[in-house]
Amino acid sequence: MRFFHSRTCPPLPGKLWSRQPRRNGATNMSEHQLDHRAGVIAAVVPCYRERASILDVLEKIGAEVSHIIVVDDACPDGTGEWVRSECADPRLTVVTHTANQGVGGATLSGYTKAIELGADIIVKLDGDGQMNPEMISRLVRPILEGRADYAKGNRFFRLQGISGMPKMRLVGNVILSFASKVSSGYWKIFDPTNGFTAIHVKVAKILPLDQIDKSFFFESDMLYHLNVNRAVVADVPIDAIYGDETSHLKISRILLPFAWKHLNNLVNRLIINYLFRDFSFASVQLLVGMVLIAFGTIFGGINWYESVSTGIVAVTGVIVLAALTFSFGAILLLGFLNHDIQNQPQRPLYPDL
């Protein structure tokens, strides 16, 4: 990859590309004002075929952001070069990939560059215009106030905010949200695929960035890695913006890969959190419950098959044994599930790092 810094360029056609009003805090500080001394904020904007919208997005990024990092993920339309030639913002840095790495790979490259630039908080927003840069102040506030290590947008807080969401996308988000709750352990977090996120740099540094998924599963995989590191995640209400942009995410292509990745993360999370990091009564509930359910299912299934094959009704004791072991195992797993829901990280990591 290559790094470019912006040069002084002509303003956008028909628009005054001026940062002065925003640096005076009159426009983009939204309804909340941030203490700039609290942290240096870098905004990472991954791009792939977003030449039509990227400049409008960059123009709306306010003075609370010290660095703007545009990552050209080998765009066939040369988005990075376009931004470099048209944007005169002195905060701009362009990172160019020679090969496409996916939205996760582009975001991680932006993280790396933001760390090099000395950022304290890294915000990620897409270049398609669906995320309002004027909400950056709201997004980073839980981190600046020491209430969270990672903050993410949630489009489902306000029902009127999702009225414009396409129906298939709405259904898909509900399904993916539940799957992410199970696999990541953040049971109170919703809208996991939302790409409007912020993370404290100290937390980003302890994550295995080279192991995080680089595809569209990136946001969900981030939640898994944050949980096994016991990071606090906050949901921030945001409004979604839907236009005529084309989504690169195809449900038919991600259904099975996402299901497998969620299952893999679930198994790894349970092993790490309940066997390696801690072994408690909840661990016993999990292990014994799984064994009893497996025994009840297999034992009952074998005897049911023999009964059907031979025409001889299984004895009452066999039926009761299979039912009791399965039921007791289910009770234990429900107890474990209740513990897991309550076991979300509560104390932010970064103040102690």
Protein language model annotation of sequence segments:
Residues Y48-E64:
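Short, well-formed alpha-helical segments that are part of the catalytic scaffolds
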Residues V40-A42, H67, D221:
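Cell-envelope/extracellular polymer assembly enzymes that use nucleotide-activated donors
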Residues V95-E116, I121, P133-F216, G243-R253:
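Acceptor/aglycone-binding surface of glycosyltransferases and processive sugar-polymer synthases
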Residues L58, S66-C75, V95-T96:
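Short beta-strand/loop segment that forms part of the nucleotide-sugar
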Residues R2-F3, N24-H36, I212-D213, F217-L353:
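Hydrophobic helical membrane-anchoring modules
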Residues D72-E81, A99, G129:
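A conserved acidic beta->alpha catalytic loop
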Residues A52-D56, D77-E86:
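Acidic helix N-cap motif at the loop->helix transition within catalytic regions
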